[in-house]
């Protein structure tokens, strides 16, 4: 019966050895995969994540700086636009004042032209009156001469005839002097009035010319300011459109970056979960391996002819640490025999036994 038990134990031992070899091979593969995941993937993903995060922050900072610069330019353009509007209002007020002055000058010119026409009419009337008086004077002189000729009497040769011719000449000279004086006074008055009107017309014409020049200058300035205002309005609209486009693009890019960050975080979480799953599998395999090591050691003692019967209880394996890339597991099984207690402690790291100790205590009956 003991031989059958040993044979059965040998068969079980052989199957356990095959299973242990298979598990050791799987353990090595899992350890290599774990080292790869622990040493390379997390750092690479972390570096990629940090690099993308830094790039996104740089882009966000650049967009914020561009936005602030565009806002400053927009404020400056708004200030320039307000200044130009103020200047435009002032120029419009000056133009209105110039137009009012021009209308006043036009009224003065019209009044001066009307006065000139009236004076010319008076001069024509005076010249007509002078011509009429001259004709009347000549007619009166002719009638007087005819009367004097008709009233002449013949006297004797020794009697001297009255000096009528001299009197007529004196009268004619007096009338001619009066007519000449009146003509000269009229001509002088006409010349003075004409000169005054000419000076007034010249002054009004000069003022009108200056007013026209000022009006043209104001008109050119208004046109230039209007063109500048339209240009600034176009620039302001263009900058506002660019600002809206940049804000929309910034919002879209920010949303894309947030999606990318969320996706990377999800991938990192998935990798962490997968790593935890592999670590759990590795822990389970280590537990199985330790149990098999204990059972193999027990069978080895049986094969060496140990006479006592060993009952190995089910062990609990805890306190596995993977944070510092090291695994510290202590197993303290208790082997109950009839007369003694064997306690074996095995400590492993990365799948290799680094410390093993066995103690034996006598069991009191």
Swiss-Prot record:
Region described as Coil 2A: 164-185
Gene Ontology BP terms: intermediate filament organization; regulation of chaperone-mediated autophagy
Segments for region (Linker 12): 148-163
Gene3D superfamilies named in the record: 1.20.5.170, Single helix bin, Vasodilator-stimulated phosphoprotein
Region feature Linker 2, mapped onto this chain: 186-189
Annotated stretches, region: Coil 1A: 6-37
Segments of this protein annotated with the region Coil 1B: 49-147
Region (Head), start-end ranges: 1-5
Stretches assigned to the IF rod domain: 2-310
The keyword Protease belongs to this UniProt entry's keyword annotation: no
Pfam families: Filament
Cellular component annotations (GO), alphabetically ordered: cell projection; cytoplasm; intermediate filament
Tail: region residues: 311-365
GO molecular function: structural constituent of cytoskeleton
Region described as Linker 1: spans on this chain: 38-48
Keywords, ordered alphabetically: Coiled coil, Intermediate filament
SUPFAM superfamilies assigned to the protein according to its UniProt record, in alphabetical order: Intermediate filament protein, coiled coil region, Myosin rod fragments
Segments for region (Coil 2B): 190-310
Keyword Ion transport in record: no
Family listed: Belongs to the intermediate filament family.
Protein name, entry field: Glial fibrillary acidic protein
Native source species: Carassius auratus
Gene: gfap
